[in-house]
Amino acid sequence: MYKTKCLREKLVLFLKIFFPILIYQFANYSASFVDTAMTGQYNTMDLAGVSMATSIWNPFFTFLTGIVSALVPIIGHHLGRGKKEEVASDFYQFIYLALGLSVVLLGMVLFLAPIILNHIGLEAAVAAVAVRYLWFLSIGIIPLLLFSVIRSLLDSLGLTKLSMYLMLLLLPLNSGFNYLLIYGAFGVPELGGAGAGLGTSLAYWVLLGISVLVLFKQEKLKALHLEKRIPLNMDKIKEGVRLGLPIGGTVFAEVAIFSVVGLIMAKFSPLIIASHQSAMNFSSLMYAFPMSISSAMAIVVSYEVGAKRFDDAKTYIGLGRWTALIFAAFTLTFLYIFRGNVASLYGNDPKFIDLTVRFLTYSLFFQLADTFAAPLQGILRGYKDTVIPFYLGLLGYWGVAIPVRTLFDSLTDFGAYSYWIGLIISLIVSGALYRWRLTVIMKRFESLAKSKC
């Protein structure tokens, strides 16, 4: 990160940060995409099982990665204030925090997942695949969270290209392990859909090993003296949790509502479950665009706010939101035109493809809503405003999606589509609430700046 003097320099810096994050996010979401697509080609029953498993996994995993992502604004503020010597200490505290959170998530997966999956009305075969998938996936919890901390460090330092290069390794690693374990190639035991969970875990262990080597060999990081182990500092841990818990909670509130919808849909046939999850899976892949802008906004805004250059932060906000709209125009057009081709990536059954196309059409609307809402979350994180957005997210997602879904399900014959309508309206409401909060925060900082003149 560095100080910029004009709009052109800001645009160049923003795009330099944004594009590597975008490629990184695509690679990150590709793990779930590869698991779902390759399992769908195996058979529909296993796809339904993996779909149910990811509905449980995603909220808790994103909650914990959201907590450790608090490292980005913390380091951003240090750099903006010229306190680079504080970076290593915060990095190690988040490593310790990630290890503790890994143990919590591991226990939840091993003990709670089977109870939930066996009591929501799933067919026995589908539930069995889901449980085995989660058990295999739990092997990779530690490297998943530790890599998230390393990535947050690199991103906050502006080394987003390095994060991108590391994450690009995930797709070939995950695809290779999945091919061996799902289909039983080259004498490896055929595990079906559950093998996708083990494939993802193995891929992340390899990725973590490579990341640690890079961390200590990268010339630009040697000035941080990361080789010096820093002991546990509970005050810094508490600061990280204080800032990270609302971030994780906000992400959890959004992701969990999608997952709850997926679990409620257990009452439908395996075909509908598989079609719903396939459409949702590809929509998650497309979410990489607004999510990347959100991450980039958190980096640049936190840096400028830390340096007390509030007008520069405001300029970046405008750049980020326009970038989101431009990319949305391209991605939504692409999905609308090629939604039939997208559906065929997940299976060959004509009924399955037709149903998935319908779900993908609904997904266009909540992807548009995400274009407005997601960048606002990153901007608010850049201002270190996380608590109020958490409650706004709870209100917007949970206070709207479920009641609207229930209303449409009871009064219309929309069936499974009622769930998607509820999600779309909840995203629109959440985006409006985040925009209101940003207006309040920006006025507060502008008043603070004027009072010090």
Curated annotation (Swiss-Prot):
Keyword Ion transport: yes
Pfam family, one: MatE
First-listed, main subcellular location of the protein, grouped into a coarse class: membrane
Ranges that cross the membrane: 12-34, 54-76, 96-118, 128-150, 162-184, 194-216, 243-265, 285-307, 319-338, 358-380, 387-404, 414-436
Keyword Transport: yes
Subcellular location: Cell membrane
BP terms from Gene Ontology: monoatomic ion transport
Family the UniProt entry places it in: Belongs to the multi antimicrobial extrusion (MATE) (TC 2.A.66.1) family.
NCBIfam families, per database record: matE
Name of this chain's protein: Probable multidrug resistance protein NorM
Gene: norM
